[in-house]
Amino acid sequence: MVLNHLGLDISKTDMCDYLEKGSVGHTDPKEKFIGDPTDSNSYGCYSPVIVKAANKYLESKSSEYKAKDISGKKLDDLFSYIDDGKPVMVWGTVDCKDGSYTVSWTVNGKTVKWYSPEHCMVLVGYDDNNVWVADPMHGDVRSYKKSTFSDRYDKLGKQAVIIEK
């Protein structure tokens, strides 16, 4: 969605070809997408995987844009990017539902806990009480109460990605 916003013509399914993929129980979501992104039963991935895939695509098109991981910022700190016309990819939950850790596994001696229903969206607007996100799963823009969305964003590790020159 963000790449299309910047005038780059790529579909969600074509973008999936740029993702590194791994399997449940053997993969760290910070390193690879867990499962097959075209399968609704797959898990997902976190910001470093998206940055790597986006940059791989951008380099293949000789684009001057670069994906940048800006994770760790409070939700309110992302609004300056929106003010500058830069949509921000953010992690939260499907339909802003409350979530929980549903499964865990060990990769290279480190425990990976999966928070579900994890979902990546694009933050496109805000006001004092609400945020608006472009949701690739639904294909539209949705509004959520800012405090609830901030809670979900925090629970997913305050992950955020921008694409800029």
Question: Predicted segment positions?
Answer:
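Cysteine-nucleophile protease catalytic domains, especially the papain-like/related folds used
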Residues: 1-86, 165
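Short acidic/glycine-rich loop or secondary-structure boundary segments that cap or lie
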Residues: 76-77, 98-100
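Structural motif
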Residues: 89-91
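Noncatalytic regulatory segments and standalone regulatory/sensor domains
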Residues: 96, 102-115, 124-165
